[in-house]
Amino acid sequence: MSKRTEQLTELLAPVVEDLGFVLWGVEYIQGRGAVLRVFIDHADGISVDDCAAVSHEVSGVLDVEDPIPGEFNLEVSSPGMDRPMFDITQYVDYIGEDVQLKLLAPVSGKRKMTAAIVAVDGDTLVVELDGETLRVPYSQVDRARLQPRFN
């Protein structure tokens, strides 16, 4: 997680939580057409009205605190079924599910893989790929997203 993303998460988490939601994660894409994506979650799901309410409150905080120079678009949404993963603690609730991983360095010769989440062991993600158990240091995970199974 970049320093800016960490700062935005720290700034926005209390705002989102005060509205009764969980801040699932924050993505900031710099450059022309910059975008700040705020993912919110709730045990009962997320509605469009929920996103609008959070967007309104988050916009106010961003206007006052001004943590991002220049113009950007704010997007507030549910993380969805194929949710991006932002923190190693988020994997615990999805043990047994598949996750797409993009790694900074290869593990067992692979930088990209879709594997089943087996466990979280401290700062290590344990996954199973083709019958082989792999230990992936979380510091090596560049991006991760749940891969829903449709049976």
Curated annotation (Swiss-Prot):
PANTHER family associated with the record: RIBOSOME MATURATION FACTOR RIMP
GO biological process, alphabetically ordered: ribosomal small subunit assembly; translation
Recorded GO CC terms: cytosol
CDD domains the record matches: YlxS_C
Origin superkingdom: Bacteria
Protein keywords: Cytoplasm, Ribosome biogenesis
Protein name listed in UniProt: Ribosome maturation factor RimP
InterPro entries to which the protein is assigned, alphabetical: Ribosome_maturation_RimP (IPR003728), RimP_C (IPR028998), RimP_C_sf (IPR036847), RimP_N (IPR028989), RimP_N_sf (IPR035956)
Major subcellular site: cytoplasm
Locations listed in the record: Cytoplasm
Pfam families: DUF150_C (PF17384), RimP_N (PF02576)
Family: Belongs to the RimP family.
Function: Required for maturation of 30S ribosomal subunits.
Disulfide topology: none
Annotated organism of origin: Alcanivorax borkumensis (strain ATCC 700651 / DSM 11573 / NCIMB 13689 / SK2)
